[in-house]
Design a protein with these regions (language model features):
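Extended intrinsically disordered, low-complexity coil regions enriched in Ser, Thr, Gly, Ala
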Residues: 81-87, 123-138
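Membrane-topology segments of multi-pass transport proteins
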Residues: 106-108
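Duplex nucleic acid-engaging cores and interfaces of nucleic-acid transaction enzymes
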Residues: 1-81, 85-86, 97, 102, ...
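Single conserved hydrophobic/aromatic residue that forms the stacking wall/gate
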Residues: 156-166
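Intrinsic, low-complexity N-terminal interaction/targeting segments
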Residues: 150-153
Length: 166
């Protein structure tokens, strides 16, 4: 992740909330420091944890936030939907009971997406197949899962022929 001190970090939680954090609000520390818990910087609720952070320098209509949930749902929302900040966070995606947000990324709308499951199953598709939705929408199915399977990772590439190794 590359960011300067005025970059905003969009912090997405497992419960589908988004929180905003300016890089300059994160205390500086040496490389041997223990760090500081995010709950001291962001107001998280009980059982909530940050699953991904996305740096944003500028909000525009040409970029999107792509999200994936544990149940295989994907959602693409225009970046400008996230520019109005609230201290207590905002809903980024509406989740079904028992579902969790597992990954997010900023895209230009033309990337290729890969969803990977705990069983080693993967689905690779063009992001153009996912239409843009409002901030509180639920999303669409990105991968069909068998019982006991869940998505563990969201990856993206700029070309269908790119090799993805994780």
């Amino acid at each position: 992740m590359v960011a300067n001190t005025h970059t905003t970090l969009l912090c997405f939680s497992n419960l589908g909330q988004v929180y905003w954090l300016k890089v300059y609000e994160i205390p500086s520390a040496g490389r041997s420091a223990k760090g500081r818990p995010l709950v001291n910087l962001i107001q998280l609720s009980e059982g909530e944890r940050i699953t991904s952070m996305v740096p944003v320098d500028e909000y525009d209509d040409n970029h999107f936030i792509l999200m994936a949930t544990k149940s295989g749902t994907v959602k693409k929302t225009v970046l400008t939907e996230f520019q109005n900040q609230r201290k207590g966070g905002k809903r980024a995606i509406t989740l079904e009971e028992g579902d969790e947000l597992v990954g997010t990324t900023v895209t230009d709308g033309n990337k290729f997406v890969m969803l990977v499951t705990n069983a080693g199953k993967a689905a690779h598709f063009s992001e153009t197949e996912v239409r843009s939705m409002g901030r509180t929408a639920k999303g669409v199915r990105g991968i069909k899962l068998d019982k006991e399977q869940h998505v563990i990772c969201l990856l993206y590439t700029s070309d269908a022929a790119d090799e993805v190794v994780s």
